[in-house]
């Protein structure tokens, strides 16, 4: 008989780079999870915007099981049918002509930044290597991507960092303009800063970045790892803005919970990446590709995308009602089903405590820094699940406020 697993085992056996919740989920269905003790949770965290179709979706399970019964892996010396079908679906649905597959958002952003450097070096010379990113951004945990992220708390312990990366203020085109010049090879930006507090870019800001990149022959990279695959009510957030990037990174929801990432780009940009310039062992494996192909098929429909916009209204209306009652938030913001509740000054820095109270009440939420409670539920979350989950969240808010005033 195997040894029972407890939360304490994490503290004994794992490298302590995470501080997970005190309970261990063991089963999920739709937007509900159950822990080892059988307690039910409504999941509004969605695996950090990953589980776009909830837990154990029957059609995703079928796609995975069907491919699992055929073969799992061959390596990049061979291609496979699921990855080619997935590539064609992404190309048909977006601006892209070419796709590179990997396993995560960090890998996709790493590939995008490497491509941008090589494109500039090949076309203009090695002097054109500057990357402009934004403060409070998040692009992954590799040394290159964490340096681009603009959050010193994540990068300061790993110096020396890659050079030629500078950070402008987000949503401030004048700040960006002061840094972007003819030595800039790329600008990387999130259409909505997720980890940075669920801050949507303005239309003028993204349009201004496009114009600056065109003027200085720099590539514009949209990091859509968190905003992509229906999260905002469009398949990709760039479609809201009417601004087309040169490169787009996608991951998280693309696999619906199965690890997969991708870099989308144009024929012109892709042409500099020749055999051997980049690669990954597992990228585009048939298991991930089969699942991601089914995810795209289910999400990229008018019914699903319009449903995201409807669900946004459900959440915002209820969250504003909760806020009217308890006065916790200064703002409820976001697009689609990426929503942030910004704590007012009286509760600054206490988002984590609210998320912990929520879990005790049976609802899972996220934070985005110390001042924002973040919601990133499944795109197909039902109205009943929204109602039940937000009732539990309201109870958590009541307990949090009463505890603070007692």
UniProtKB/Swiss-Prot annotation:
Enzyme class: transferase
One GO term of the biological process aspect: ornithine catabolic process
GO MF annotation: an example: succinylornithine transaminase activity
EC number from the UniProt entry: 2.6.1.81
Keywords associated with the record: Aminotransferase, Arginine metabolism, Pyridoxal phosphate, Transferase
Pathway: Amino-acid degradation; L-arginine degradation via AST pathway; L-glutamate and succinate from L-arginine: step 3/5
Names of required cofactors: pyridoxal 5'-phosphate
Keyword field contains Transferase: yes
Catalytic activity: N(2)-succinyl-L-ornithine + 2-oxoglutarate = N-succinyl-L-glutamate 5-semialdehyde + L-glutamate
InterPro entries referenced in this protein's UniProt entry, alphabetically: Ac/SucOrn_transaminase_bac (IPR017652), AcOrn/SuccOrn_fam (IPR004636), Aminotrans_3 (IPR005814), Aminotrans_3_PPA_site (IPR049704), Class-III_PLP-dep_AT (IPR050103), PyrdxlP-dep_Trfase (IPR015424), PyrdxlP-dep_Trfase_major (IPR015421), PyrdxlP-dep_Trfase_small (IPR015422)
Superkingdom, natural source: Bacteria
Pfam families listed in its UniProt record: Aminotran_3
Gene3D superfamilies according to UniProt: Aspartate Aminotransferase, domain 1, Type I PLP-dependent aspartate aminotransferase-like (Major domain)
UniProt family annotation: Belongs to the class-III pyridoxal-phosphate-dependent aminotransferase family. AstC subfamily.
Role: Catalyzes the transamination of N(2)-succinylornithine and alpha-ketoglutarate into N(2)-succinylglutamate semialdehyde and glutamate. Can also act as an acetylornithine aminotransferase.
Listed name of the protein: Succinylornithine transaminase
Species in which this protein is naturally found: Shigella sonnei (strain Ss046)
Gene: astC
């Amino acid at each position: 008989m195997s040894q029972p697993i407890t939360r304490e085992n994490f503290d004994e056996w794992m490298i302590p780079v995470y501080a997970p919740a005190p309970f261990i989920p063991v089963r999920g269905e739709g937007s509900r999870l159950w822990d080892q003790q059988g307690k039910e949770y409504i999941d509004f965290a969605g695996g950090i915007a990953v589980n776009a179709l909830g837990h154990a979706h029957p059609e995703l399970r079928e796609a995975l099981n069907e491919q699992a019964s055929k073969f799992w892996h061959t390596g990049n010396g061979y291609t496979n049918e699921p990855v080619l079908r997935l590539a064609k679906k992404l190309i048909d649905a977006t601006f892209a002509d070419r796709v590179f597959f990997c396993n995560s958002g960090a890998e996709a952003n790493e590939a995008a930044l490497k491509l941008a450097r090589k494109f500039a070096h090949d076309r203009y010379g090695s002097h054109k290597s500057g990357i402009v990113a934004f403060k409070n951004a998040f692009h992954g945990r590799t040394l290159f991507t964490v340096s681009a992220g603009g959050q010193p708390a994540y990068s300061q312990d790993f110096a020396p960092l890659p050079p030629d990366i500078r950070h402008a203020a987000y949503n401030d085109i004048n700040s960006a303009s002061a840094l972007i010049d003819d030595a800039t090879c790329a600008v990387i930006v999130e259409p909505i800063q997720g980890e940075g507090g669920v801050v949507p870019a303005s239309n003028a800001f993204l349009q201004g970045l496009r114009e600056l990149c065109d003027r200085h022959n720099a590539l514009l990279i949209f990091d859509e790892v968190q905003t992509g695959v229906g999260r905002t009510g469009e398949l990709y957030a760039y479609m809201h803005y009417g601004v087309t990037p040169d490169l787009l990174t996608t991951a998280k929801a693309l696999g619906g919970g199965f690890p997969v990432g991708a870099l989308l780009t144009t024929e012109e940009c892709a042409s500099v990446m020749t055999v051997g310039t980049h690669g990954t062992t597992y990228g585009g494996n048939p298991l991930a590709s089969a699942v991601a192909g089914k995810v795209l098929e289910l999400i990229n429909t008018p019914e699903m995308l319009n449903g995201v916009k409807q669900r946004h209204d459900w959440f915002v209306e209820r969250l504003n009602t909760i806020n009217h009652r308890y006065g916790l938030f200064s703002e409820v913001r976001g697009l689609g089903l990426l929503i942030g509740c910004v704590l007012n000054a009286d509760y600054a820095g206490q988002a984590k405590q609210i998320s912990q109270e929520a879990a005790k009440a049976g609802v899972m939420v996220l934070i985005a820094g110390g001042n924002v409670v973040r919601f990133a539920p499944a795109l197909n979350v039902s109205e009943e699940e929204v109602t039940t989950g937000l009732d539990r969240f309201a109870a958590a808010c009541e307990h949090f406020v009463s505890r603070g005033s007692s």
